[in-house]
């Protein structure tokens, strides 16, 4: 029994980054709770501690007007417990998953709070990071030999990528607490869904229909980025609560959380190839800024600006098949009239010119392979996973001045990822190396890591996050230098850190 469920295509899916790294932990030996002789509940879960230490000083200014001196300080001391309950009532399977997290306010986090509060931008990071969440609560039942229903709060996964998403569009992600983790199911935001799947045996496939009725809270919609000045805020915004100036509006006429999302997916096989065709109407994952000077639909409620999640249509397809000694994967997701901010590039108000809609195609090609053994002490062959992502603005014009952070966005934004992992001592020691490089703008990330699995219950993992800049990417200083060339990995400048995680799973 796993701690998170997902809908996957029929046939070979490839090794993938999640399979190569540690999956959501469980022992397979659930604790059984007998409520009555006819009602037995299986309990699984974990208790986990996270710790992160800054490896560089940040240039942002503290409340005292001097740069925050935070090298060597803890940026995270987080403690989480996840519980999954599962039981069978007649022909219906019930699952409930809850997660409870608390953070110790380190000196570094206190400095970030003081810096934001001194600017008149109130910030309480403890409230931001602590959580008591019903992650999932759903029932599964078979209505007929062909028809299956899953009803409730759940995760549905379309697509086969990690770190960056192409066709995985049903849910948003919370990227404000930690980033670049392998277990997407931990950071994906589950939704209340009606999920129906009908098997078409004659065509070796199935049809899935989804409806999100619109009863989720606004914070469950779209991706959550650190826009409040915490540890994952992009440079130079640590210690600056941007949301105090530009709050979220989840009830905008261009995108309202109460409006339903809906779509469908065909999953099938043709020979050794697994494929899907997908359509989904929803709120887009990335927020955009709606400025009062040139509003996109309704003017901001605060008379200045606000973050909104406009409604979009996404049409896509995925495929995977064995090739040579491994598995190739591909995804394509087309979004007509996708909204972007534009104008005033190279200034603190980049994107304040308003919103332009551009047809956008997201593409991914990946390849996974088991390599030859690297030595007699390796207990299994090394696994290599490669991915190439491209965000293509199909009707791109340079004069549109589409904003990528504070700089100009290109027609093609291409990122490559590579993961190498292997196992020693009967799979109890698992070193790994992740490389992420921004081919279009420069910069990237190197993550060397190692995981120790001494038995069924304990998992110890350590990683280093080493960001770098190159090519066209620079970073913005607190005094505004570098605004014209700051792209994705420029915002991660000076964010190198060591991360340790200890988990007891049951």
Language-model features, listed with the residues they occupy:
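Detector for outer-membrane/organellar transmembrane beta-barrel domains
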Residues: 76, 88-91, 280-282, 329-339, ...
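Residues on the lipid-exposed face of transmembrane beta-strands in outer-membrane beta-barrel proteins
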Residues: 45, 81-87, 136-141, 194-198, ...
């Amino acid at each position: 029994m796993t701690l998170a469920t997902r809908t996957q295509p029929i046939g070979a899916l490839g090794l993938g980054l999640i399979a190569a790294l540690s999956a959501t932990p469980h022992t397979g030996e659930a604790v059984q709770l007998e409520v009555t002789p006819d009602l037995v509940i299986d309990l699984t879960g974990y208790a986990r501690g996270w710790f992160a230490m800054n490896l560089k000083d940040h240039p942002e200014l503290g409340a005292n007007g001097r740069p925050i001196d935070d090298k060597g300080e803890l940026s995270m001391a987080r403690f989480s417990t996840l519980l999954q309950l599962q039981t069978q009532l007649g022909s219906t399977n019930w699952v409930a998953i809850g997660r409870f997290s608390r953070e110790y306010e380190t000196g570094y986090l206190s400095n970030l709070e003081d810096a934001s509060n001194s600017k008149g931008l109130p910030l309480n990071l403890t409230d931001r990071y602590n959580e008591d969440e019903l992650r999932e609560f759903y029932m599964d039942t078979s209505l007929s030999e062909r028809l299956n229903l899953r009803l409730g709060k759940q995760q549905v996964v379309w697509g086969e990528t990690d770190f960056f998403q192409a066709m995985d569009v049903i849910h948003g992600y919370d990227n404000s607490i930690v980033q670049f983790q392998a277990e997407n199911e931990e950071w994906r935001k589950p939704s209340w869904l009606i999920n129906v799947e009908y098997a078409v045996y004659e065509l070796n496939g199935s049809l899935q229909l989804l409806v999100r009725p619109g009863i989720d809270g606004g914070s469950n919609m779209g991706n959550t980025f650190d826009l409040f000045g915490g540890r994952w805020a992009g440079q130079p915004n640590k210690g600056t609560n941007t949301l105090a100036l530009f709050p979220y509006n989840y009830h905008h006429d261009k995108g309202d959380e109460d409006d339903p999302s809906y779509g469908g997916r065909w999953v099938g096989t043709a020979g050794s190839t697994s494929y899907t065709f997908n359509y989904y109407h929803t709120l887009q994952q990335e927020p955009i800024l709606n400025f009062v000077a040139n509003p996109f639909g309704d003017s901001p409620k605060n008379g200045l600006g606000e973050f909104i999640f406009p409604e979009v249509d996404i049409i896509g397809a995925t495929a995977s098949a064995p090739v040579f000694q491994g598995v190739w994967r591909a995804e394509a997701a087309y979004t007509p009239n996708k909204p972007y901010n534009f104008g005033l590039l190279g200034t603190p108000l980049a994107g304040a010119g308003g919103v332009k809609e551009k047809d956008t195609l997201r593409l991914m090609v990946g390849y996974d392979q088991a390599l030859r053994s690297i030595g007699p002490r390796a207990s299994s062959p090394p696994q290599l996973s490669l991915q190439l992502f491209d965000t293509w603005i199909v009707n791109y014009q340079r004069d549109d001045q589409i904003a990528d952070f504070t700089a100009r966005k290109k027609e093609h934004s291409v990122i490559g990822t590579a993961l190498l992992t292997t196992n020693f001592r009967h799979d109890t020691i698992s070193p790994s190396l992740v490389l992420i490089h921004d081919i279009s703008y420069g910069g990237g990330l190197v993550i060397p890591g190692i995981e120790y699995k001494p038995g069924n219950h304990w998992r110890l993992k350590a990683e280093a996050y080493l960001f770098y800049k190159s090519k066209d990417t620079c970073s913005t200083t607190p005094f505004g230098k570098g605004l014209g060339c700051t792209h994705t990995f420029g915002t991660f400048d000076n964010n190198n850190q060591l991360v340790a995680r200890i988990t007891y799973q049951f």
